[in-house]
């Protein structure tokens, strides 16, 4: 909890300064998870997406809505040309969200974690 307080206190909310932006996913006053833009590269106009949905909030379309909203911000306001996500191959629920939203698998990352490979999903914005 101290690490979280430190992160919140030190974050400016400026993706250009911090290189990342973390947004909490809230529904009716309850926190359902968070979504991040990180590895922000303004020169090449790309960023990674990370997302966590609390177990009690899964299966309700919250992740899909969060990805759509972060895309609007990334492609519309930040003028990014590419977003990507690295998803463990076992995390089929998350891969389903990205596939449904038009991301394409571009590579398999072998032994990405101790337990699993990962899939690199990309969406190029024309």
Regions found by a protein language model. Name each.
Residues 1-20, 27:
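Active-site rim helix/loop that mediates acceptor-substrate recognition in acyltransferases
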Residues 26-126:
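Acyl-donor (CoA/ACP) binding surface of acyl/acetyltransferases
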């Amino acid at each position: 909890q101290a690490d979280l307080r430190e992160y919140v206190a030190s974050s400016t909310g400026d993706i250009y300064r911090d290189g990342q932006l973390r947004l909490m996913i809230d529904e009716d006053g309850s926190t359902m998870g968070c979504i991040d833009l990180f590895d922000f590269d303004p020169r090449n106009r790309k960023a990674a997406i990370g997302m966590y949905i609390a177990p009690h909030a899964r299966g309700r379309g919250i992740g899909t809505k969060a990805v759509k909203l972060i895309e609007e911000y990334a492609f519309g306001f930040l003028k990014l040309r590419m977003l990507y996500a690295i998803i463990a191959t076992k995390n089929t629920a998350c891969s389903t969200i990205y596939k449904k939203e038009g991301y394409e698998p571009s590579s398999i990352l072998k032994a990405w974690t101790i337990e699993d490979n990962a899939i690199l999903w990309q969406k190029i914005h024309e």
